[in-house]
Regions:
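S-adenosylmethionine
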Residues: 1-440
Length: 440
């Protein structure tokens, strides 16, 4: 009699196969599958853990599988590869799942012809997995970092070049742990104290941020269907993104341009900071995404946002020098959010080569919308200097009318008007912010 397949693990396998074959983002594939699923909440949580965990730890898991089998992972069928990864991930990282269950449940999902092989590899890990040696840190440091932190060798080398090897390892280690969810309290509807109290009464752990009073860190998962989020009393926004909004510093009555606004969290935070007084022009290249801002603003009780489809590189003379503040949160390589989007780590680094010029073009165009004495903020969710400090330097070299201005928030201080946040320092996304002021 064949063992019944575990539906949670079966769905996780389907999602992993789909992301491999279609190149779909993990979070999008997962969200789509879970919305259609009738699984229980604990089973959905297991699916999420397996999909994110296997994606994040792929290099480490493949290294282990190759050490346990005479057949290299790259030569195996895609489904079998993902089954071995799922099984090994449970054995290596999920202590709460007994080893026998991890093995048997994984084997039950395998094609009949591959069950013996999958069973043999996983059982071999239970016998000698702890004895497998990783590459030597001294003689093969790049390979050691790659296998230990499941990052491609070229990315390890780049991070070591940027930060130095010791600091880079701290950053890599932090990218292996998803940061706690951070909420931005909508002070148009609730106070931080009220929000914290209500969430605690519902059984969620929340902690006030020591950086921003409107930020609440939530170690527990808070479902999007919770009353506080549904009623717009708060929304999810990483602390780095909230810091960016504070650096922009919009005041009630200001005219603000958010040049690359979708999905809208910085737009919303800015409107709340303005007490819903003034005007925000929220633009994005993708018309299909603008509805996210409109629906989010309605839920939050914000009515000062005007959304339009616009390429931020294309000049609009009607906007010239109308804005007190302009935010250019530009498209970037995303190498600061590996903990949330683990598949980004496997991107070819050369794919981002064209981005700095695109980002600079946005900055050079949108700077013309800033009034004399106004503020221009440039931000990315990457930690690569060519998209960050180097781009700001290129901009300033041809725009002497702008000057960097230092800022400080909760003990976090900029240098030369620029700040790079890394997950090992403050538990945020990797993020870059530059504050530039137009001379009056």
């Amino acid at each position: 009699m064949e063992q019944m397949q575990n539906p949670a693990r079966a769905l996780a396998l389907q999602i992993l196969n789909r992301t491999d074959s279609a190149g779909q983002y993990t979070n999008l594939a997962l969200d789509s599958a879970l919305k259609k699923s009738s699984l229980s909440a604990p089973d959905k949580a297991l699916v999420t853990i397996l999909v994110y965990g296997v994606t994040e730890r792929r290099i480490t898991l493949d290294y282990l599988a190759d050490a346990l089998s005479s057949r290299p992972m790259e030569a195996l069928d895609g489904t079998v590869r993902n089954l071995l990864r799922m099984g090994l991930y449970q054995l290596c990282y999920l202590d709460r799942i007994p080893a026998h269950a991890a093995v048997s449940e994984t084997v039950s999902l395998a094609p009949r012809r591959a069950r013996g092989f999958v069973n043999a590899v996983l059982r071999e890990y239970t016998r000698r997995g702890q004895d497998i040696s990783f590459p030597d840190k001294t003689t093969d440091p790049d390979r050691y970092l790659s296998v230990t932190y499941s990052l491609p060798v070229p990315l390890c080398r780049k991070l070591a070049f940027i930060f130095g090897r010791e600091r880079a390892e701290s950053v890599m280690e932090a990218f292996g742990h998803a940061p706690p969810v951070t909420l931005r309290v909508n002070t148009l509807k609730a106070s931080p104290e009220q929000m914290a109290s209500e969430l605690c009464e519902l059984g969620y752990r929340v902690q006030a941020s020591d950086v921003l009073p409107t930020a609440l860190r939530a170690p527990d998962f808070i479902p999007s269907g919770s009353p506080q989020l549904q009623e717009g009393q708060a929304f999810v926004q990483d602390l780095a993104s909230q810091i960016c909004v504070e650096v922009l510093g919009a005041q009630p009555g200001d005219c603000v341009i958010d040049a690359c606004a979708c999905p809208g969290s910085k737009t919303f935070g800015t409107a709340i900071r303005m007490q819903n007084k003034g005007k925000i022009l929220a633009y994005d290249l993708h018309k299909s995404k603008l509805s996210l801002i409109e629906s989010g603003a309605a839920r939050l009780g914000i009515d000062i946002i005007e959304v339009r489809e616009r390429d931020a590189r294309s000049h609009d003379p009607e906007l010239r020098e109308i804005a007190d503040r302009v935010l250019c949160d530009v498209p970037c390589s995303g190498f600061g959010v590996l903990a949330k989007k683990p598949e980004i780590r496997y991107k070819d680094l050369s794919d981002a080569a064209a981005l700095p010029d695109i980002q600079l073009a946005i900055l050079q165009n949108c700077c013309r919308y800033v009034k004399d004495g106004g503020v221009l903020v440039y931000s990315t969710c990457t930690i690569f200097p060519e998209e960050n400090e180097q781009n700001v330097a290129r901009f300033l070299a041809s725009h002497p009318e702008f000057a960097p201005e230092d800022f400080s928030l909760g003990g976090i201080c900029s240098t030369g008007g620029m700040l790079t946040l890394t997950p090992d320092d403050h538990g945020t996304d990797g993020f870059f912010i530059a504050k530039l002021v137009k001379r009056a």
